[in-house]
Design a protein with these regions (language model features):
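Small-residue-enriched hydrophobic alpha-helices in membranes
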Residues: 1-45, 52-159
């Protein structure tokens, strides 16, 4: 997730549109609070996967917050979750278990979360080895075939 890319704005707009429904379009009920916490926690963990959380990665998260038009409460929840992930204070399996309490494994919402994490990981055009490890584990824990991750990485332009 490190580095910079010219198409970041387009990626954020697409993700904001895709994730808006998952996160309640800015209105946070219980399911949306869980989804927001899981998404941003995993974004923090993904950013941390290559050992350094860059200002670019933080900028991506802030851009995504703007695109999602979260309420003040939603932004606070998202940033707290991102910081937990960034500080390595969460467990991938536990976070996904939380997600599965409000969205079924294999649901459209889980697919959107997966797609968004992959897109942000490749936003700079490359995947570092620890980011790939994170994405591989995420893929398996979501119940997807590893080939799906490879297809998405090719589609989104990872090298």
């Amino acid at each position: 997730m490190a580095g910079s890319g010219g198409g970041i704005g387009a990626v954020l707009r697409d993700m904001g549109s895709s994730l808006g429904e998952l996160l309640g379009g800015g209105k946070l009920g219980q399911a949306e609070e869980v989804s927001t916490g899981v998404l941003f926690g995993l974004l923090g963990a993904l950013a941390r996967a290559d050992s350094i959380v860059t200002s670019h990665e933080t900028g991506l998260v802030n851009g995504l917050l703007d695109e999602l038009k979260l309420s003040t409460r939603g932004r606070e929840l998202a940033l707290t979750a991102f910081d937990r992930g960034r500080r390595n204070e969460l467990n991938l399996a536990d976070e996904l278990d939380r997600l599965f309490t409000v969205h079924a494994r294999g649901s459209e919402q889980a697919a959107r979360l997966f797609d968004s994490l992959v897109r942000l990981a490749v936003a700079d055009g490359r995947i570092r080895p620890r980011e790939r490890e994170f994405l591989n584990e995420l893929t398996l824990r979501l119940g997807y075939d590893p080939g799906l991750l490879e297809d998405k990485l090719k589609r989104y332009g990872s090298t």
